[in-house]
């Protein structure tokens, strides 16, 4: 029993142990699985990150056009880092020590600042004196542009008395050692000497001035200097000169002024066309300065506000600036000349200003001046000043395809060209434009220790009297281009001797045919320019002559023609031409001006008799004044000699005027006045004569000189209402409808013009009998009508037709006498008309 119980207990314990072991194994497997999963995740994450970095590194490497594996990317990265390390070490070796150079300045900026502080400039010359490099700071010290010195000899800018000494210093120093070892170049080649250098000027005619300078430098072998140590110097050497310089030595020196300058010119413009804006009062005081000004001039706005602009200008530029400002005040806008402005760093900077005056929007008073200042370089200023002086800037002599040994050939070319130009013009010319081509400078200078800093040129030996001939050619060309040649003969006479003499020039020895042909090409170019300018001037002359001829013709048309009034072909009517009247009354009748109707000459007496008989035909052409025939003149004198009121109509008088009759159409109405005046202007006529005609109510015709023609028209009242219409806006001919006194009310538009005193019945018969020969010119039928059509205000549909008939009825005149009793003023006019009317029974038809 006990055994059975113990066995059962043992079996239960074993079962419990097995289950616990199984559970433990399961737990261990779960833990291992979890660890493995986490490890795989971390490994995958690391691989992904590594791949991303490799990919990014490969994208930064150059030459990654093809896909690279990881090892290639790593290898190229290693190569790049190794090369970068070498370059960094090389740069550190040539880097200026940080203890005395600020970290925020580069080597070039620090070098420029050091040169400005030392009042010096860099100069690199060969042992024979050829200049191969000049820093830009030479302009602020000696007023030379770098292009003036490069490829020139240093002896051209040193007085002649110092040539031998400087040449000895440059040449004998290298004879001490035949081999240029690195140790020698580092330790024993230090060289210092003093001499005088020529100062540049804008005008070459100014006397030369020399500055006492000091050279401090050493010799450098051009092939021993590393590319990183060149610091931009290699780029300044021309490519054609580099092979000859590779095995040679140059002298690199810092040239300093013995006497420092207190104020220098800031001539280097790193960014051209820099500008800033300011506003000034009318007294030229600063009112505003924009944010672009401080980096250029150094002043902040509050430092200049209220100060005058003239406080910052150079004393030599004040006169020109004052003229520019006067021009501004006169015209309201303008552009200034080049002038120097003093910066805060005590340096002169060249500026040019565009300015204009702004006005108040309400009262239009000037408020202030707006200025836009532009920074310009000294090269532009010098070129502009020399152009004003008539001197052209010349380019440097050397070209890219010439070597150093071509200097002698250039001299031969310039000498031969000088001979050609001297044959062309024997008169001497002043010195030329640029000092860059100066080859010699003859000035006697005493010992430097006893001479002042600035040595003026001795007048007995001018330093620039021997000049290259090509400079004279440039100056002559500029003078020729500024001349005005008036004809082709002048241009040909100037240019033909040039070519004829140039072609006859012998070619000097050592001078190639190509070089001589280049000179002839230059002469031909000059000749072509002269001929082209001559043709342009001739064309201008011909055009001006043609314009002058047209103006003269127009003046002759205005002053030479008389008064001519034109009739429209569609509107026939009566038109009076140039009426010539004498001044005052005379007892003897001289001549009567004829009136042309449809090309027929009709004397005035025929018109008068025609008015009495009513035979006046319609006219279709303009009236032209012609010479009176002798037969009509005699008949008119015989007829009108007995008139109590006589009319004088001479054909020509001295100092007379012609009166154009601008039409004024008068249509009578009962309420209107009976007197109408028609003024007309009177232009001049060189061949015809005129006077002033006055028609009065008492039927007297008076003629007196004056500037205005006053025509008095007597209007007869009619039963129907009429309107007085001034037709000056129509600008047509004078239309006169002679009065018809019919019994019908339809003939209401009547215009009566009294031109002469009516004669007695016996005189009427005599007038009719005498005028029979002259009236043969009129071939009209007995019954004619005078009509005129006039467009009112340009409207073709609206026409004003004045029609008047002249029937031979005896009841006409009593009917008109009966109609003149409507008003007191018209009654007086009717009495005058009744006294002057002839007996209708004695009027005979023509």
Swiss-Prot record:
Keywords: Activator, Acyltransferase, Biological rhythms, Cytoplasm, DNA damage, DNA-binding, Isopeptide bond, Nucleus, Phosphoprotein, Repeat, Transcription, Transcription regulation, Transferase, Ubl conjugation. This is Circadian locomoter output cycles protein kaput. Transcriptional activator which forms a core component of the circadian clock. The circadian clock, an internal time-keeping system, regulates various physiological processes through the generation of approximately 24 hour circadian rhythms in gene expression, which are translated into rhythms in metabolism and behavior. It is derived from the Latin roots 'circa' (about) and 'diem' (day) and acts as an important regulator of a wide array of physiological functions including metabolism, sleep, body temperature, blood pressure, endocrine, immune, cardiovascular, and renal function. CLOCK-BMAL1 double mutations within the PAS domains result in synergistic desensitization to high levels of CRY on repression of CLOCK-BMAL1 transcriptional activity of PER1 and disrupt circadian rhythmicity. Changing residue 116 to K: 3-fold increase in PER1 reporter activity by CLOCK-BMAL1. Some reduction of CRY1 inhibition of CLOCK-BMAL1 transcriptional activity. The gene is CLOCK. The keyword Isomerase does not apply. It is found in: Nucleus; Cytoplasm; Cytoplasm, Cytosol. Residues 447-463 have a biased composition (Polar residues). There is conflicting data about the effect of NAD cofactors on activity. PubMed:11441146 suggests that the redox state of the cell can modulate the transcriptional activity of the CLOCK-BMAL1 heterodimer; NADH and NADPH enhance the DNA-binding activity of the heterodimer. PubMed:23229515 reports that NADH and NADPH have no significant effect on DNA-binding activity of the CLOCK-BMAL1 heterodimer. Pfam families: HLH, PAS, PAS_11. It comes from Homo sapiens (Human). The modification Phosphoserine is found at residues 38, 42, 408, 427, 431. Residues 450-570 are annotated as: Interaction with SIRT1. The record marks 84 as: Important for interaction with BMAL1. The modification Phosphothreonine is found at residues 451, 461. GO terms for cellular component: chromatin; chromatoid body; chromosome; CLOCK-BMAL transcription complex; cytosol; intracellular membrane-bounded organelle; nucleoplasm; nucleus.
């Amino acid at each position: 029993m006990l055994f059975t119980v113990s066995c059962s207990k043992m079996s239960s314990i074993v079962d419990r142990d097995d289950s616990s072991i199984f559970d433990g194994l399961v737990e261990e497997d779960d833990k291992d699985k979890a660890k493995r999963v986490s490890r795989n995740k971390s490994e995958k994450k690391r691989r992904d990150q590594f791949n991303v970095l490799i990919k990014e590194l490969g994208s930064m490497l150059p030459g990654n056009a093809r896909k690279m594996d990881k090892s290639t990317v790593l290898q190229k990265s290693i190569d790049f880092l190794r090369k970068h390390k070498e370059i960094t070490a090389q740069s550190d070796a040539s880097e200026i020590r940080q203890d005395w150079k600020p970290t925020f300045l580069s080597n070039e900026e620090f070098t420029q600042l050091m040169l400005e502080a030392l009042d010096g400039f860099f100069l690199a010359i060969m042992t024979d004196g050829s200049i191969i490099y000049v820093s830009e700071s030479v302009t602020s010290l000696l007023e030379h542009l770098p292009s003036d010195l490069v490829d020139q000899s240093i002896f051209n800018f040193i007085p002649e008395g110092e040539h031998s000494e400087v040449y000895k210093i440059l040449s004998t120093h290298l004879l001490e050692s035949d081999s240029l070892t690195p140790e020698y170049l580092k330790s024993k080649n230090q060289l210092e000497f003093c001499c005088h250098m020529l100062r540049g000027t804008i005008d070459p005619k100014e006397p030369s001035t020399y500055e006492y300078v000091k050279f401090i430098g050493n010799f450098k072998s051009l092939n021993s200097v590393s590319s990183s140590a060149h610091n931009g110097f290699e780029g300044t050497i021309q490519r054609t000169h580099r092979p000859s310089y590779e095995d040679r030595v140059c002298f690199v020196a810092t040239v300093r002024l013995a006497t420092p300058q207190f104020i220098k010119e800031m001539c280097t413009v790193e960014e051209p066309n820099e500008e800033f804006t300011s506003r000034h009062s009318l007294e030229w005081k600063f009112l505003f300065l924009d944010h672009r000004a401080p980096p250029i001039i150094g002043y902040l706005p509050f430092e200049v506000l209220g100060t005058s602009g003239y406080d910052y200008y150079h004393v030599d530029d004040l006169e020109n600036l004052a003229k520019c400002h006067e021009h501004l005040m006169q015209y309201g806008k303008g552009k200034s000349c080049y002038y120097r402005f003093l910066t805060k760093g005590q340096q002169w900077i060249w500026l040019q200003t565009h300015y204009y005056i702004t006005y108040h929007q309400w009262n239009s008073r000037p408020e202030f001046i707006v200025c836009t200042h532009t920074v310009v370089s000294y090269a532009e200023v010098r070129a502009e000043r020399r152009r004003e002086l008539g001197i052209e800037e010349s380019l440097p002599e050397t070209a890219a395809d010439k070597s150093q040994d071509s200097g002698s050939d250039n001299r031969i070319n310039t000498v031969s060209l000088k001979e050609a130009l001297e044959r062309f013009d024997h008169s001497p010319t002043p010195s030329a434009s640029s000092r860059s081509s100066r080859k010699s400078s003859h000035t006697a200078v005493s010992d430097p220790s006893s001479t002042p800093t600035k040595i003026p040129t001795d007048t007995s030996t001018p330093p620039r009297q021997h000049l290259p001939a090509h400079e004279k050619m440039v100056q002559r060309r500029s003078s020729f281009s500024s001349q005005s040649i008036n004809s082709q003969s002048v241009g040909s006479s100037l240019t033909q001797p040039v070519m004829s003499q140039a072609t006859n020039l012998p070619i000097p020895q050592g001078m190639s045919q190509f070089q001589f042909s280049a000179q002839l090409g230059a002469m031909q170019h000059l000749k072509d320019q002269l001929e082209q300018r001559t043709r342009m001037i001739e064309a201008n002359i011909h055009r001006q002559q043609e314009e002058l001829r047209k103006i003269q013709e127009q003046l002759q048309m205005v002053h030479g023609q008389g008064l001519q009034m034109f009739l429209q072909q569609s509107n026939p009517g009566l038109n009076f031409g140039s009426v010539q009247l004498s001044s005052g009354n005379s007892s003897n009748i001289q001549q009567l001006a004829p009136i042309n109707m449809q090309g027929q000459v009709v004397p005035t007496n025929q018109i008068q008799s025609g008015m009495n008989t009513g035979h006046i035909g319609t006219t279709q052409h303009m009236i032209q004044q012609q010479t009176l025939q002798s037969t009509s003149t005699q008949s008119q004198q015989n007829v009108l000699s007995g008139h109590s009121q006589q009319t004088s109509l001479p054909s020509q008088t001295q100092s007379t005027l012609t009166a154009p009759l601008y039409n004024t159409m008068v249509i009578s109405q009962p309420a209107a006045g009976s007197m109408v005046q028609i003024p007309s202007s009177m232009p001049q006529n060189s061949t015809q004569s005129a006077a002033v005609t006055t028609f009065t109510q008492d039927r007297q015709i008076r003629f007196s000189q004056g500037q205005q023609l006053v025509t008095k028209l007597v209007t007869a009242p009619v039963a129907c209402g009429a309107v007085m219409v001034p037709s000056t806006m129509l600008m047509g001919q004078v239309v006169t409808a002679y009065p018809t006194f019919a019994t019908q009310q339809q003939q209401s538009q009547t215009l009566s013009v009294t031109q002469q005193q009516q004669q007695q019945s016996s005189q009427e018969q005599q007038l009719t009998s005498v005028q029979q020969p002259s009236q043969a010119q009129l071939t009209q039928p007995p019954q004619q009508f005078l009509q005129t059509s006039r467009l009112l205000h340009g409207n073709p549909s609206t026409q004003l037709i004045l029609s008047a008939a002249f029937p031979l009825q005896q009841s006409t005149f009593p009917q008109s006498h009966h109609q003149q009793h409507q008003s007191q003023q018209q009654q007086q006019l009717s009495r005058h008309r009744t006294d002057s009317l002839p007996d209708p029974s004695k009027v005979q038809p023509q």
